[in-house]
A protein has these predicted regions:
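Histidine-anchored nucleotide/phosphate-binding helix
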Residues: 21
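A cross-family phosphate/adenosyl-ligand binding-site feature
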Residues: 41-53
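Active-site-adjacent pocket-lining segments in enzyme domains
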Residues: 3-6, 12, 27-35, 52-55, ...
Length: 182
């Protein structure tokens, strides 16, 4: 069974984080919600409070098959400023493991070089963060071990793309049917 982490920052887009967690858990993927702050309690961009599973400081990112970044503001800024997040992204990328980001969060990958040479997408207005990438406006883009997506309205497609990457396209199709999607 695959094991991934989703980095939860205060100010994250709640739907982008929690939809992914819900759908991946339904598919049997072990996904840990890691708070990048000093508390398990996280407050999203729209004031919704939820509790992460662990503090990021209590886990080793090397133990995961991939990491996921929800977008939202100021959540994306908080992720980008966090040295543990940046270190984890570099380690995951160097190891060829999954890195998935949605909405504004793919801009982090453009700025730190993870997206260099990759086909990517993001929320409109962040195109300039990808000077060394091929930017497209598809809902979800998978290029090797990097998956990017546009925003809240594409969160289910994003989660299904992660299932396809980690398990199989059949598993993603089955999940879409099971949740009455499309």
């Amino acid at each position: 069974m695959s094991k991934v982490a989703i980095f939860m920052a205060d100010g994250c887009e709640e739907i982008e984080g929690l939809t992914v967690v819900d759908i991946l858990r339904r598919a049997g993927v072990k996904i840990d919600m890691l708070s990048i702050g000093d508390s398990l309690n996280v407050t999203g961009a729209h004031g919704i409070q939820f509790r992460a599973d662990y503090l990021m400081t209590d886990k080793n990112s090397d133990d995961y098959d991939g990491v996921i970044l929800p977008g939202g503001m100021p959540g994306t800024t908080n992720l980008e400023k966090n040295t543990l997040v940046q270190s984890a992204l570099k380690k995951q990328f160097s190891a060829g493991k999954l890195i998935a980001a949605i909405c504004a969060a793919p801009s982090i990958l453009g700025k730190n070089g993870v997206a260099n040479g990759k086909k990517v997408t993001s929320y409109p207005g962040f195109e300039d963060a990808f000077p060394r990438s091929t930017y497209v406006t598809d809902s979800v883009v998978t290029d090797g071990n990097v998956i990017t997506s546009r925003g809240m309205g594409t969160a289910i497609d994003f989660a299904l793309a992660i299932i396809e990457y980690l398990i199989s396209s059949d598993a993603a199709e089955d999940m879409a049917k099971n949740i009455m999607y499309k």
